[in-house]
From Swiss-Prot:
Family classification: Belongs to the protein kinase superfamily. NEK Ser/Thr protein kinase family. NIMA subfamily.
Keyword annotations from UniProtKB, A to Z: ATP-binding, Cell cycle, Cell division, Cell projection, Cytoplasm, Kinase, Magnesium, Metal-binding, Methylation, Mitosis, Nucleotide-binding, Phosphoprotein, Serine/threonine-protein kinase, Transferase
Protein known as: Serine/threonine-protein kinase Nek4
Metal-binding as UniProt keyword: yes
Phosphoserine: modified positions: 340, 343, 675
Species this chain originates from: Mus musculus (Mouse)
Origin organism lineage: Eukaryota, Metazoa, Chordata, Craniata, Vertebrata
Length: 792
């Protein structure tokens, strides 16, 4: 059932036809309202007519009309109509919140123009609203008018009495509805005038204590007092829309062509354009933030666990467990002692293999954050490319024979200033306490023959970049000792003919990257160019297929690793590379692509140089988001759901604003003269004839069957004419007056009501009616008016 596609949230309103419920679509996540209409007592023809009309209305596309998504008839006898949700509520409630404080004229005319444009669109489509009132005019959160409940009451209003089902209380009913005339588009203009009067005065244009008095006031033709705090043009426009004779009321099209309205449309148009351009700027800025949001989310939700795994006599390696981690640029990394080798002696190679499998899906991901440009100026001297090593502090040069305790002391000294680029590898404190011994991390692959693996030597210090803030910690995989020995042997052979490098500069806190042969390497950077322009940028670098094959041959993969590897390749490879690196960054990688593993240290340096020398275009960010793994997306979903929803809604509102701007521009271009259609409908003889274009016009009163065109036979013949309701009202009123006064006294009262002198008339009425004057004088006057002006 279509109803199952929505998640019900709460009831937002109830009416005479049913209730309105706020729902959320399970698939697209958008909010809608479902209006449930009770059709249990309606005939099958009436139900079909209501549903067909709802489907017709769902095709209307206008920025000032509530969108209709779908409708269906449930098995419970209810008609369900799904409409767009307006966060600002209805206009009636908005006016009540004013608490007597009048709105500025610009706001009144702004809403007035939007309602008028919606009515003009409906009238051009030959659709009458028939139930225009402030309760059916809604506001979005950007203060845009949405006219709703279009034509739904046409079928339903014929059941029950007029006071409860016609339009609730008929504050907006035009005088012709109480006579032998059908509903016409000029009745919509009357209702529009009532709405504008209510917006200007915060009161109903016609009000009374009871239904009979209200009908009498409307038919009497006595205009309410016009608002004095507004311009005479607005007051005159309201007065013409509330003219008793329909032919004297202007059409909606002519209203929008008046100079007074055009002037306000121009002002509103300029304000809307400015708001739209401002929203566009915000949307452009928000597009540069999703990657940074992912980084900050991971910083809050994830933790690193670093284990020191004892090696064989040939050396030791670093093993890292956990998910991909990204650390914020603002927060320093807490550096604590590592677990001592003695605490991990019980770990076996099999366990290491399992741990490797657990992190295999993300072992190829490198995350790098680049410091904004304002901090580069003071650190440009420290930015060193791989081909140009420069000076480093003597404290950063590590003696090959230094002890573990010396390294620990130097590490603790650097911890005190986490903002300095000399920080070493970041580590979380473990349960072992501060008293446990710790060692610096050494890389899996030495970069030249001068630096040989030694258990007491730290070789994990990479190129120093003073401009780089403490950055994200890339993920390194678990490796078996046998695998490490194989890799070190390969590295010794590889580095035998490579260039020598006597020094290594220290890198801000981050872990060494793993062998980048499996899948993709994501580089997330926050940097600014020399022109102080920049934002979160990101790139995805695919490793070559050859190096991927070489990595698979290094060691046998477990079943879990193979599953993760296959899943990672299926997810990553189709997206393709999103960034083209500069030639300077590609050239150092060429020797390693020929069936040789890439040194982690050199690869990291190449990535750093690439990011420093190459500014990624902003339009590449969208492609980056497709390259993120499921692990990254799942870890950041909760933090980005709302922003994505806001962005989606913001885009929808921006489109609506653009449509509104285009519509107002077209409205300003309307000609000043009446069209042929307007001239034809102003003919009094055809004013209330059931026009052939108005297929959904409701015949409220009279015998017009011979005038109905053939295509109007769609209207249900079982509909009770509106005159039947009025006739019942008059009958009830007549019975009440006759019972209270009697026929003879009622005839005398009718004669006295024809007296021209008001004072003499009232005196004689009091004399004849006595104590009944207060109760029956007004009722007798209403009964006389109905019998003289309303024909049945």
């Amino acid at each position: 059932m279509p109803q199952a596609a929505y998640c019900y949230m709460r009831v937002v309103g109830r009416g005479s036809y049913g209730e309105v419920t706020l729902v959320k679509h399970r698939r697209d996540g958008k909010q809608y309202v479902i209006k449930k209409l009770n059709l249990r007592n309606a005939s099958s023809r009436e139900r079909r007519a209501a549903e067909q009309e709802a489907q017709l209305l769902s095709q209307l596309k206008h920025p000032n009309i509530v969108t209709y998504k779908e409708s269906w008839e449930g098995g419970d006898g209810l008609l369900y109509i799904v409409m767009g949700f307006c966060e600002g509520g209805d206009l009636y409630r908005k006016l009540k919140e004013q608490k007597g404080q009048l709105l500025p004229e610009s706001q009144v005319v702004e809403w007035f123009v939007q309602i008028a444009m919606a009515l003009q669109y409906l009238h051009e489509k030959h659709i009458l609203h028939r139930d225009l009132k402030t309760q059916n005019v809604f506001l979005t959160r950007t203060n845009i008018i949405k006219v709703g409940d279009l034509g739904i009451a046409r079928v339903l209003e014929n059941h029950g009495d007029m006071a409860s089902t016609l339009i609730g209380t008929p504050y907006y009913m035009s005088p012709e509805l109480f006579s032998n005339k059908p509903y016409n588009y000029k009745s919509d203009v009357w209702a529009l005038g009532c709405c504008v009067y209510e917006m200007a005065t915060l009161k109903h244009a016609f009000n009374a204590k009871d239904m009979n008095s209200l009908v009498y006031r409307i038919i009497e033709g006595k205009l309410p007092p016009m608002p004095k705090v507004y311009s005479t043009e607005l007051a005159e426009l309201i007065r013409t829309m509330l003219s008793r004779r329909p032919e004297e009321r202007p059409s909606v099209r002519s209203i929008l062509r008046q100079p007074y309205i055009k002037h306000h449309i121009s002002l509103f148009l300029e304000a809307t354009k400015a708001k739209t351009s401002k929203n566009n700027v915000k949307n452009c800025d928000s597009r540069a933030k999703p990657v940074a949001a992912v980084v900050s989310r991971k910083e809050e939700s994830n933790t690193d666990v670093i284990h020191y795994q004892p090696r064989s006599s040939e050396g030791s390696a670093l093993h890292v467990m956990g998910e991909d981690k990204c650390l914020s640029q603002e927060k320093p990394v807490d550096i604590g002692p590592l677990r001592s080798p003695a605490s991990l002696e019980g770990h076996t190679g099999k366990q290491d293999m399992n741990n490797t499998g657990e992190s295999c899906a993300t072992i190829s991901r490198i995350n790098i954050d680049i410091l904004p440009a304002e901090r580069r100026d003071s650190a440009n001297a420290g930015v060193v490319q791989e081909s140009q090593p420069q000076h480093v502090d003597a404290a950063d040069e590590v003696d090959s024979q230094c002890s573990i305790s010396q390294e620990k002391e130097r590490l603790q000294g650097n911890t005190k200033s986490s903002d300095q680029p000399g920080n070493l590898l970041p580590r979380r404190s473990s349960d072992g306490g501060d008293g446990e011994g710790s060692e610096l991390v050494k890389p899996l692959y030495p970069s030249n023959k001068d630096q040989k693996p030694d258990q007491d030597q730290v070789t994990g210090i990479i190129e120093n970049q003073d401009s780089i803030h403490p950055r994200s910690q890339p993920h390194s995989s678990m490796s078996e000792p046998s695998l490490s020995r194989q890799r070190r042997q390969k590295k010794r052979e590889q580095t035998a003919h490579s260039g020598t490098k006597s020094q290594f500069q220290e890198l801000p806190p981050r872990l060494l990257p793993s062998y980048p042969g499996i899948g993709k390497v994501d580089i997330i950077a926050t940097q600014q160019n020399d022109g102080n322009q920049g934002g979160p940028v990101a790139g995805c670098v695919n490793s070559s297929r050859t190096s991927s094959t070489a990595s698979a041959k290094d060691r046998p993969l477990s079943a879990r690793e193979r599953r993760r590897l296959k899943q990672s390749q299926e997810e990553m490879l189709p997206s393709g590379p999103a960034v083209q690196r500069t030639p300077s960054a590609v050239e150092p990688l060429k020797p390693q692509e020929e069936d040789q593993p890439i040194p982690a240290q050199r690869f990291s340096s190449d990535c750093s140089i690439t990011q420093m020398n190459h500014t990624l275009p902003r339009e590449k960010e969208k492609r980056l988001m497709h390259g993120l793994s499921e692990d990254e997306l799942s870890s950041s979903t909760s933090s980005t759901d709302k922003s994505d929803g806001d962005s989606r809604e913001g885009k929808s509102h921006t489109n609506e604003m653009k449509d509104l701007v285009q519509l107002m521009t077209q409205t300003l271009r309307l000609e000043a003269k009446e069209s042929c259609e307007d001239l034809q409908v102003l003919n009094p003889g055809s004013e209330f004839r059931l026009h052939r274009k108005y297929r959904d016009t409701l015949v409220l009163h009279g015998k017009v069957a011979e005038e109905v065109e053939p295509h109007c036979t769609e209207l249900p013949t079982g509909i009770i004419p509106g005159s039947e309701k009025i006739r019942r009202i008059v009958e009830v009123l007549r019975a009440d007056v006759i019972q209270g006064l009697g026929i003879q006294l009622l005839e005398q009262v009718f004669d006295l009501l024809g007296e021209e002198d008001e004072l003499e008339r009232e005196a004689r009425l009091q004399e004849h009616m006595g104590d009944k004057y207060t109760t029956y004088c007004v009722k007798a006057r209403q009964l006389k008016f109905f019998e003289e002006n309303v024909s049945f």
